[in-house]
């Protein structure tokens, strides 16, 4: 398991737990839209997603607003 907030996440078969760590006040509109697309609504909110290319791309768009943990499926 690792925690990351940088743009180093790669698509894989892993499951990601994505947590919103910062608010969206003052953020760009596309960053707000990306968080909503991930299903994040407020600080501290967590969602679980597969690490496919779409999810990884969205996480890499807002690394300064989220923290990511990889959960082993085994």
Swiss-Prot record:
The keyword Disulfide bond does not apply. It comes from the Bacteria. GO terms for biological process: translation. InterPro entries: Ribo_uL30_ferredoxin-like_sf, Ribosomal_uL30_bac-type, Ribosomal_uL30_CS, Ribosomal_uL30_ferredoxin-like. It holds the Pfam family Ribosomal_L30. One of its GO terms (molecular function) is structural constituent of ribosome. Keywords: Ribonucleoprotein, Ribosomal protein. The keyword Ribosomal protein applies. SUPFAM superfamilies: Ribosomal protein L30p/L7e. GO terms for cellular component: cytosolic large ribosomal subunit. Part of the 50S ribosomal subunit. Belongs to the universal ribosomal protein uL30 family. PANTHER family: LARGE RIBOSOMAL SUBUNIT PROTEIN UL30M, MITOCHONDRIAL RIBOSOMAL PROTEIN L30. This is Large ribosomal subunit protein uL30. It comes from Micrococcus luteus (strain ATCC 4698 / DSM 20030 / JCM 1464 / CCM 169 / CCUG 5858 / IAM 1056 / NBRC 3333 / NCIMB 9278 / NCTC 2665 / VKM Ac-2230) (Micrococcus lysodeikticus). The lineage of its organism: Bacteria, Bacillati, Actinomycetota, Actinomycetes, Micrococcales. The gene is rpmD.
């Amino acid at each position: 398991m690792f925690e990351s907030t940088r743009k180093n996440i790669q698509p894989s078969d892993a499951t990601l737990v994505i947590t919103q760590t910062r608010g969206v006040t003052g953020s760009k509109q596309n960053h707000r839209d990306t968080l909503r697309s991930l299903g994040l609504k407020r600080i501290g909110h967590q969602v679980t997603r597969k690490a496919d290319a779409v999810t990884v791309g969205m996480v890499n768009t807002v690394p300064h607003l989220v923290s990511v943990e990889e959960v082993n499926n085994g």
